[in-house]
């Protein structure tokens, strides 16, 4: 039995000013397939702000408004997950975490104990950062970078075998594919340079706060602790499905400590 953390961001779960329900449904079916195979799954999700905006169109450029949208949107987001997962026979559970929860050994232990109970009963833990109070993320300073680094902490402290980050790109390219048509996906990465980890963070879209850099920082965090991360396209789950369900590496990038594959 594997324990897998899946992270999905706002760029995938929203389309314009609406929620992308077709993508959420595809994600939930994929999770159901993994669970049917016997895997334990923890989902780290963004998009509370995006969900809130569907109910109240506040100016997202103002931090208090983004916090308010997160407060409005989190229950809406969980309701969408509940409606989508129920026909698949999956019961979801919400957990809101922050950087502080991983700075405190006691709080980390409490969260871990909760996760263990949920997984032991077949429940799907759905984790988001507590955006209504996590001002740094909403202020685009990205404590966890649209939950990229949060998902790495979840994978590490909750003993996952691998973190799957579903993104709006096919993997980690050797150069910017928007500028260089000959850019190629790096299939396996064993090491990341300081230059790669310190580049400027750029948002994916109006709702997202992460970028490729926060994903690399998540990968670096896990590799240094002997754990793996797989970066794949979330618009089409074919590569993620092949890798995790069939053990076939088509596209996508596997980040793993040197020498492994």
Curated annotation (Swiss-Prot):
EC main group: transferase
Binding site for substrate: 46, 131, 147
Pfam families found in the cross-reference section: AA_kinase (PF00696)
Binding site for ATP: 7, 167-168, 209-215
Keywords linked to the UniProt accession: Amino-acid biosynthesis, ATP-binding, Cytoplasm, Kinase, Nucleotide-binding, Proline biosynthesis, Transferase
Catalytic activity: L-glutamate + ATP = L-glutamyl 5-phosphate + ADP
Main location: cytoplasm
PROSITE patterns for the chain: GLUTAMATE_5_KINASE
Protein family: Belongs to the glutamate 5-kinase family.
Protein name in UniProt: Glutamate 5-kinase
Naturally occurring in which organism (per UniProt): Wolinella succinogenes (strain ATCC 29543 / DSM 1740 / CCUG 13145 / JCM 31913 / LMG 7466 / NCTC 11488 / FDC 602W) (Vibrio succinogenes)
Gene name as annotated: proB
